Every structure is written in C-alpha cells, then in structure tokens.
C-alpha cells in the first residue's frame, strides 16, 4: 500500500512544477504543452481500454453487466461533474495575462482552482486504486496524471502571480489543486485498506477506466488542440500509446507487475 500512495503523492506534486514555471516566467511553448496533454491522453486511453477494463472483467466472480456497468458509470459520472463544475480552460487564463484586469483574472483563476481540485480528487483515488491492483499500470497512470498536472499548475499560478505580484500566493493557489489529488489518494488508502475484496477492487477499476477515457476525450485532447491549433494532438496521443504499450510489454517480459 505504501508504493501506490507514494505514486499518488508524486503525481499530485507535479502541479508544483507547473506553478514554479508560472511564477518564474519560463512558460513552455504551446506546442510542448499540447504534445504533453496528447501524450497523457494516449497513456490513459491505452491503459484504460487495453489493461484496466479487461483486467476488471477477467476478475473471478465479476459479471460483464457489473463490469461494463461500472465503466459506464465512470464515464457518465465524469461528464456529469464536468458539466456541473465551474469550467475554464488553462489556455484561456494564460491568454488573459495580457489584459489589464487583474481582479477578474484572479477570480477566474480561483474558480479554475476549485474546479480542478474537485476534478483532481477522483484522479488521486484512481491513481491509488490502479497502483494497488497492478503496480505497472499504476506507474503509467501516475505518469499521465503528472504530465497533465504540470500545465494545470502553470495555468493557475501564472495569472494569480500576474494579478497579485506574489509568488507565494500563486504557488499556494496552484498547489491546492495538487493537494486535492493527494487527499484523494490518502482517503483511498485509509478507506480501501479494509475493502480489499477482488470484486470491489475490480468494480472500482472499471469505473476508473471510464473516468480516464472520458477525461482523455473530453478534456485533454480538445485542450491540446485549443492550445496549439496549428499542430495535430494525435501525434502526442499516438506517441503516448506507443511508448506506454512498449513499456508494458517490456515490464511483462521481465516479470514486473
């Protein structure tokens, strides 16, 4: 249980990398940000559809109705929360840095922070649950989550810093979203320790797979296209899928996971 918790902590802490980039003014190019988001989406799609969902369905005692039902619940649950939460895109905030409305920018950044925090909370649970069930998949999910946490931290810290002039305040607000992910992992660690039934774990994995697919197709890929409309995010997606698939083959070949 310790390694999955550490992976969750590291994935959430990646938000601070973006936060520091935001206050230091060394913003990565839009092309790099877009590619990293596509790369993260590719990792999540491959792991969710080729590993997590099949593993959940293959669990002894798991019925297809329950497995696919939990997958659909994960999909619909994500879309439902996404529609209910205050929603602003990171690149919108980065563009607003040029406008002389610091108070408005700060309010928007805070709303985004709250939305991202609620959005990151189940990601922390997903990372922990996946790593607890299968460590090699946990590494992949943690990497994908960390990659897309970096532009999130950058998106919040940059505008807050521009509005307040305080690096500490900017890092604080950006860090909240990362802490929400860590909190999700810690709660999963505390609660799921007594709920280690294979069926329960498989059902949660199926739901997590649905969440990851929805996150990839509804958020990461469109966001990558918006950030860098001149380049196709599919390259990042395909690269993420290829590298993750190759790494899983290597890990399975040498007997890890």
UniProtKB/Swiss-Prot annotation:
Organism this protein belongs to: Salmonella heidelberg (strain SL476)
Main localization category: membrane
Transmembrane segments: 5-25, 32-52, 61-81, 109-129, 137-157, 171-191, 195-215, 236-256
Domain of life: Bacteria
Gene Ontology cellular component terms for the protein in this record: plasma membrane
Protein name: Zinc transporter ZupT
Gene Ontology MF terms: metal ion binding; zinc ion transmembrane transporter activity
Protein's cellular compartments: Cell inner membrane
Catalyzed reaction equations: Zn(2+)(in) = Zn(2+)(out)
Family recorded in the similarity comment: Belongs to the ZIP transporter (TC 2.A.5) family. ZupT subfamily.
Lipid bilayer topology: Multi-pass membrane protein
